[in-house]
Amino acid sequence: MAAQVASGVGNLNLNSEDGAAAKNISAQGSPENEARESDGEYDDDQGAPELGNTTAAKKKKKKTKKKKKGTSKVQTEPPRVILSSLFPNNQYPEGEIIEYQNENAYRTTNEEKRHLDRMNNDFLAEYRYAAEVHRQVRQYSQKAIKPGQTLTEIAEGIEESVRALTGYPGLEEGDNLRGGIAFPTGVNLNHCAAHYTPNAGNKMVLQYEDVMKVDFGVHINGRIVDSAFTIAFDPVYDNLLAAVKDATNTGIKQAGIDVRMSDIGAAIQEAMESYEVEIKGTSYPVKAIRNLNGHTIGRYEIHGGKNGKSVPIVKGGDQTKMEEGEVYAIETFGSTGRGYVRDDMETSHYAKIPDAPNVPLRLSSAKNLLNVITKNFGTLPFCRRYLDRLGQDKYLLGLNNLVANGIVDAYPPLCDVKGSYTAQFEHTILLRPNVKEVISRGDDY
């Protein structure tokens, strides 16, 4: 969902409850041990029976075992263990810490303390919680996604894992506003760069020769972590992916307090367009998609709201500066096509407009649907599958009416020319007073 338009497994079963444990995470006790302890199977106080109690001891069939000390809870495959049980003290891993370059390295002591006091409480804990959920879900997904799966299976598997790890299933009123999915899972194939998720009945299947951008978000109390990666099975696309990953990392390196957006865009474009990719004997320069941008992230507002800023991925233009305390999605898109996207295909993504006008609605279906959207999503983006999941039906007329009245925005898929291939990588960064934190960084990208 993160893309902002410039103005102008075999069989994957991510829903399966089976699977071996994947990732050891420091915590106290294992899930199995805790369950046994609660049933009384383990008892440290039990020793050898006294002489007068030998009969009672013989009758006791449960085998006495010592508690295992130091064992760690683990995440399952697919991910289903709520993250708070793996980190009982709410001490979630920090992201990659990067010092500011040159003149941005020095911040006055009092200013730093004031801001750190504000950031080192719920703000950072909630962001790091969301980021760790994103890492665990995507790292499993990158291993599990295979050709032959439907896009619906892939998207819903990721979403089910996010709901499980955050502990917010999203079926009760207001549940999704407390935490969970921040926007619909984008599974964008080939020339489609962004904003595509399957609607109900979609039968599209992932093929070996496809290039798929997977873009999903996690939030805790409106603190949104927005990160994306690209999957390609055919090594012919390796240079395309390398170009975009390099460009995103270049943007992250350049970003910082008082840095101009135009300078970041120029560095991103230079990095990306130094690559080319050969497909079926033809060489294609990798072009930065000039009308897609990174962006600020606000609380419950993926594009930062009315005061949001854009981070270009080409040179020229905006002289606006980044500021301390801001949160950014640094994302880049590369293409073998024209390097320009347009609206295409069936719309699936929608979002209620912050401070939308108070328009009298004549259609009762529109009124009812607006109430559902407000109570379940607020200003977080949603898709038609999410409305289906809440039991809504025959809502398209009302939804289109909300769009027509300027209350809800529609976000159609954004595509380059057919036959081209696009790639995306994205991270969320926090501009802390003395360092920037790449909150979504992982071992994978």
Curated annotation (Swiss-Prot):
- Family annotation (NCBIfam families): met_pdase_II (TIGR00501)
Q: Name one Pfam family in it.
A: Peptidase_M24
Top enzyme category: hydrolase
Q: Where is this region: Disordered?
A: 1-80
| Catalytic activities | Release of N-terminal amino acids, preferentially methionine, from peptides and arylamides
UniProt keywords (A-Z) are:
Aminopeptidase, Cytoplasm, Hydrolase, Metal-binding, Protease
For bias type Basic residues, the affected ranges are 57-71
Species, as recorded:
Paracoccidioides brasiliensis (strain Pb18)
Stated name of the protein: Methionine aminopeptidase 2
